[in-house]
Amino acid sequence: MSKIDKPLDSWREELTEEQFHICRLGGTERAFSGEYHATKTPGVYHCTCCGTALFDSDAKYDSGSGWPSYFQPVDGEAVRELDDFSHGMHRIEVRCGRCDAHLGHVFPDGPRPTGLRYCINSASLKLVPREG
């Protein structure tokens, strides 16, 4: 997968204010406020910045957290995980594997088969519904 590296000013021109704040500055939307937290439409969730496929609706579940939650990404290259020591705690940040957009965090309290909960901001996603 070819990487995308753009200056912040380019991203600022292409994204909404909320998308820029979350994806490029590492922000977080309020729980239960995002477009996709309760969506059950079958399809694939892509990065809002670069269009890379990130999560399939087959891996989406209701974690009760108020953010879209998935037990796995579409493949091992779709996302990358980084240590995050902000806010006085240790978490694992999830970023787009192609453009490095901040997506959310992953926690070890998810369902089978992975036991993981990818807790993702709706503003970092674009749902492409499955046809048929």
Swiss-Prot record:
Its cofactor is Zn(2+). SUPFAM superfamilies: Mss4-like. Zn(2+) binds at C47, C50, C96, C99. Disulfide bonds: none annotated. The active site is at C119 (nucleophile). Its EC number is 1.8.4.12. InterPro entries: Met_Sox_Rdtase_MsrB, Met_Sox_Rdtase_MsrB_dom, Mss4-like_sf. Binds 1 zinc ion per subunit. The zinc ion is important for the structural integrity of the protein. Keywords: Metal-binding, Oxidoreductase, Zinc. It comes from the Bacteria. GO terms for molecular function: peptide-methionine (R)-S-oxide reductase activity; zinc ion binding. It is an enzyme of class 1 (oxidoreductase). It catalyses: L-methionyl-[protein] + [thioredoxin]-disulfide + H2O = L-methionyl-(R)-S-oxide-[protein] + [thioredoxin]-dithiol. It holds the Pfam family SelR. Residues 8-130 form the MsrB domain. GO terms for biological process: protein repair; response to oxidative stress. GO terms for cellular component: cytoplasm. Belongs to the MsrB Met sulfoxide reductase family. HAMAP family: MsrB. This is Peptide methionine sulfoxide reductase MsrB. It comes from Pseudomonas paraeruginosa (strain DSM 24068 / PA7) (Pseudomonas aeruginosa (strain PA7)). The lineage of its organism: Bacteria, Pseudomonadati, Pseudomonadota, Gammaproteobacteria, Pseudomonadales. The gene is msrB.
